[in-house]
Design a protein with these regions (language model features):
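Histidine-centered divalent-metal-coordination microenvironment in nucleic-acid enzymes
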Residues: 1-13
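Acidic, His- and aromatic-enriched active-site or binding-groove loops in soluble protein domains
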Residues: 12-21
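C-terminal accessory/tail domains of diverse enzymes
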Residues: 20-204
Length: 204
């Protein structure tokens, strides 16, 4: 199937909070940690069809495990190339063009890569917002972000040990529903999702 990747950034007072001094900020890493924690249940909003899980297999540039990284298409949450770099990517790609002087720090995003075309967009975006907020609320968020960061292709044979240390995404709608049942209290907090709505998603 086709992926439905979601790029997101956190903005405060009109300023992108994803970078600090040219590197991914603590704010961004906490948000990523929240997504790492709730990733299994987010599939209930973003992968709602049995065939969704045929896509989430190794060597398809689709995620299979709960991890994140820079410019890495084997991870669940990817930090895209270029925005934090001091090099002008436009000039590198188009050497005959004059160097641009745009402030690209406002463009930095992170990309959630598990959802597909079966997603309920309203539920998915609400679920991602809940996950990011959850990352700000848990005390060990930065430890989670550190533990789930990978800088290798986890599906290459030499990285088997790293792969085994990472939690797996659900492999079916039934497994996804079980994950949502276990983590439902986080989504029901602050009345973002009602218990009846969560029940309906689980039963579906």
């Amino acid at each position: 199937g086709s992926g439905l990747h979601v790029h997101m950034r956190i903005v405060k007072d009109g300023q992108n909070q994803m970078l600090k001094d040219g590197v991914l900020s603590e704010t961004a890493r906490k948000a990523i940690a929240g997504m790492m924690e709730l990733a299994p249940s987010i599939t209930a909003f973003g992968n709602t069809n049995p065939t969704s899980y045929f896509r989430l297999v190794p060597h398809q540039e689709a995620p299979t495990n709960v991890c994140w990284g820079d410019r890495n298409r084997s991870v669940l949450v990817r930090v895209p190339l270029g925005w934090a770099a001091k090099t002008d990517m436009c000039t590198l790609a188009n050497p005959l063009e004059n160097e641009s002087h745009f402030d690209t720090s406002q463009k930095q995003t992170v990309e959630m890569r598990s959802p597909d075309g079966s997603a309920d967009l309203y539920q998915l975006l609400a679920g991602l917002a809940v996950a990011c907020r959850h990352g700000f609320e848990i005390e060990n968020a930065l430890d989670i972000a550190k533990r789930t960061y990978v800088n290798v292709n986890i599906h290459q044979k030499e990285n088997e040990d790293k792969l085994k240390a990472l939690a797996q995404l659900p492999d079916s709608c039934a497994a996804s529903a079980e994950c949502l049942q276990k983590q439902r209290t986080v989504f029901e907090q602050y009345h973002v999702f009602s218990p009846a709505m969560i029940d309906g998603i689980i039963c579906k």
